[in-house]
A protein has these predicted regions:
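Class I S-adenosyl-L-methionine
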Residues: 1-97
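Generic hydrophobic alpha-helical segments
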Residues: 13, 57-61, 136, 140, ...
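Generic secondary-structure signature for well-ordered alpha-helical cores
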Residues: 22, 44, 115, 142-145, ...
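A generic structural motif
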Residues: 49-52, 103, 178
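Predominant activation on well-ordered alpha-helical scaffold segments within soluble catalytic domains
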Residues: 62, 85, 107-108, 171-174
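A contiguous loop/helix-start segment that scaffolds small-molecule binding in enzyme catalytic cores
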Residues: 69, 145-178
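Class I SAM-dependent methyltransferase SAM-binding "motif I" and its flanking Rossmann-like core
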Residues: 76-150
Length: 178
């Protein structure tokens, strides 16, 4: 899927969904600007929400993929998040045929800011639980020393309605610096 709503999809993506027996929507690394029902109505498919536990701990998706045509929907580019890469590699290891359909991602969408993509350094995440974590601050510091921008991916937990806001991220960076 793209970054916005049910219509923000490539033609290849739409065709893959139509051919699928089972459709999962990963709903914990990003949030779309539409409801699950909007997706189901637009694609005319039942869509099962895939939380962190289902994707990272359970084998349900892989087991279904062995005997059925499964679509695994994510907002943005499917191989930006490490959890998606892990699922892809586990499927390959089990001999499950996979195809990846790329779409717009936050990495390309950041161009709307006017900043040049080639001037970005390492990307980092600011987790919800960041009490003793300093890596994001040092990624920023290293990027700044090289004259590069930093893209921060802000953690979220939709099941608990918890999100790292921009203000939270700034407070975190200031706390680590001081």
């Amino acid at each position: 899927l793209g970054l916005d709503n049910e219509k923000d999809i490539t033609i290849n993506g739409l065709e893959a969904i139509k051919k699928s027996d089972v459709v999962y929507l990963e709903n914990y690394t990003s949030i779309l600007n539409c409801k699950n029902e909007d997706l189901e109505n637009f694609y005319n498919k039942k869509i099962f929400l895939a939380n962190r536990n289902l994707v990272e701990e359970s084998n349900e998706i892989l087991e279904n993929s062995k005997t059925r045509n499964v679509a695994f929907l994510v907002a943005g580019d499917p191989l930006v998040a490490t959890t998606h890469i892990d699922l892809f590699l586990r499927a390959k290891k089990e001999g499950i045929k996979c195809s990846v359909i790329h779409n717009a991602s936050i990495v390309s969408a950041v161009g709307i800011t006017g900043l040049q993509v080639y001037k970005f350094g390492k990307t980092t995440s600011i987790p919800l639980e960041n009490e003793n974590i300093e890596t994001p601050y040092y990624v920023l510091k290293d990027n700044l020393s090289l004259g590069l921008h930093t893209l921060f991916l802000l953690d979220l937990n939709p099941d608990e309605e918890k999100f790292v806001s921009v203000n939270d991220a700034i407070r975190y960076l200031l706390k680590v610096e001081l």
